[in-house]
């Protein structure tokens, strides 16, 4: 790709504000959602997307645990030492932050309040998993790392959940599910996976490739945790699968010159029944339908 076209593509991304990197999470979403989020919409529009309670559950569990266990945490390119507080105090701080974020609807607000009772038990499971993997090693969290592949115009950039000098850990929480019954809202546990999810393996493979440290993948709910330690050939395979998708995105941007009206002729329409699109507000939904002529 010539430099002029590369510059044009990067400038047109993020609603014309420009975007210069990919991430394991952006590469994990369906292609239509990628182009909606990172070509059609700018950062302000992305922030208007309203996440459901399950998306907040991960932060409610992981952020306090990081502050409780880690000696340093990276934020906005700088590192800080978390204040010495109990785990319960860190959780309460996170509750206060999440409570300021609008709920998606009335049901989501109820679920957000009901899920709080499961946060502390989940953090207790995370603490056990971290201790099993790292022992007494000094830990850091949220450090940015990146990879750059030949021929790919974008760096892939991500933040590590837990890290020591020799080891990394990627955490996935399984929030409580709620079901409406005649007697009201009923809660039931999400079982932990018997085998790692491929999307999570790709994320872990990225952090392994970027750090060359021993990687672990952890799943946790409010009752238990599971630790997976993939073999290196598995990690190499999943990393290449993630990079293959990055090249597909780049090729589509190159063919279309990052014009959404061309992308919508090359990429299948969004499946609005998928949870990936639940966070779009009504105006965004109409804009997306118009772009794909739905």
Give the predicted meaning of each segment.
Residues 196, 209-294:
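Metal-dependent nuclease catalytic regions and adjoining charged, substrate-binding loops involved
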Residues 61, 156-191, 207:
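Conserved catalytic cores of phosphodiester-cleaving nucleases, focusing on short active-site segments
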Residues 50-53, 187-196, 230-232:
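Short histidine-centered catalytic/ligand-binding loop motif
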Residues 1-164, 294:
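Metal-dependent nuclease catalytic cores that hydrolyze phosphodiester bonds in DNA/RNA
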Residues 140, 163, 167-171, 215-219:
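A structural signal for short, well-ordered beta-strand segments and their strand-loop junctions
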Residues 6, 87, 108, 112, ...:
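Short amphipathic alpha-helical segments that mediate assembly, nucleic-acid/protein binding
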Residues 182-220:
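Catalytic cores of nucleic-acid endonucleases
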Residues 146, 174-176, 222-225:
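Short, solvent-exposed loop/turn segments at secondary-structure junctions
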